[in-house]
UniProtKB/Swiss-Prot annotation:
GO BP: 2-deoxyribose 1-phosphate catabolic process; carbohydrate catabolic process; deoxyribonucleotide catabolic process
Cellular localisation: Cytoplasm
Entry EC no(s): 4.1.2.4
Pathways involved: Carbohydrate degradation; 2-deoxy-D-ribose 1-phosphate degradation; D-glyceraldehyde 3-phosphate and acetaldehyde from 2-deoxy-alpha-D-ribose 1-phosphate: step 2/2
Family listed: Belongs to the DeoC/FbaB aldolase family. DeoC type 1 subfamily.
Protein name, as recorded: Deoxyribose-phosphate aldolase 2
Gene Ontology cellular component annotations, sorted alphabetically: cytoplasm
Biological function: Catalyzes a reversible aldol reaction between acetaldehyde and D-glyceraldehyde 3-phosphate to generate 2-deoxy-D-ribose 5-phosphate.
GO molecular function: deoxyribose-phosphate aldolase activity
PANTHER family attached to this UniProt entry: DEOXYRIBOSE-PHOSPHATE ALDOLASE
Provenance organism: Staphylococcus aureus (strain Mu50 / ATCC 700699)
Active site: 89 (proton donor/acceptor), 151 (schiff-base intermediate with acetaldehyde), 180 (proton donor/acceptor)
Amino acid sequence: MNSAKLIDHTLLKPESTRTQIDQIIDEAKAYHFKSVCVNPTHVKYAAERLADSEVLVCTVIGFPLGASTTATKAFETEDAIQNGADEIDMVINIGALKDGRFDDVQQDIEAVVKAAKGHTVKVIIETVLLDHDEIVKASELTKVAGADFVKTSTGFAGGGATAEDVKLMKDTVGADVEVKASGGVRNLEDFNKMVEAGATRIGASAGVQIMQGLEADSDY
């Protein structure tokens, strides 16, 4: 397993500067991460900087609340793809899920999948705000809507990925949909727990620390 290829090297803080974006791009190139995940305002710049690289550009849609209208999320997606995004991480309508308005949640995801035009779509369900049954339902809706991944968290809701939630999500979606763990994955131990639970992508700002942990392990 090439661990670096499981990592979306992430910087989504609202105060992120161009200098900080340059840093994560340079790190992603050096460690051969799967992608850099940045806010939409940075997509075009990141795509230009990574044009000669295998590192993909990932961005976020309806982020972090998921409370934008479906039409807005679809437009954001189209704009991001036009600017060079390779992968889309969208946030579901969490309130609609809790209301039991499952058709609305599914249609919201489907609109982004359609707007992404074949690009990878990951669906953030914000597990920290959901109970067991809601995690299962959100994962099922992600699968039915045709997305590629179900993802745990934005990192903005006071909690992140747990191995238990990742396993539940993976057990729900089966082989057809992948699971991305994000939020609170800060070191090699966290990384390994998520992978063992079934995650095939890790969103983390600590990608370098994770890789340094792997290098230290291999020294023994």
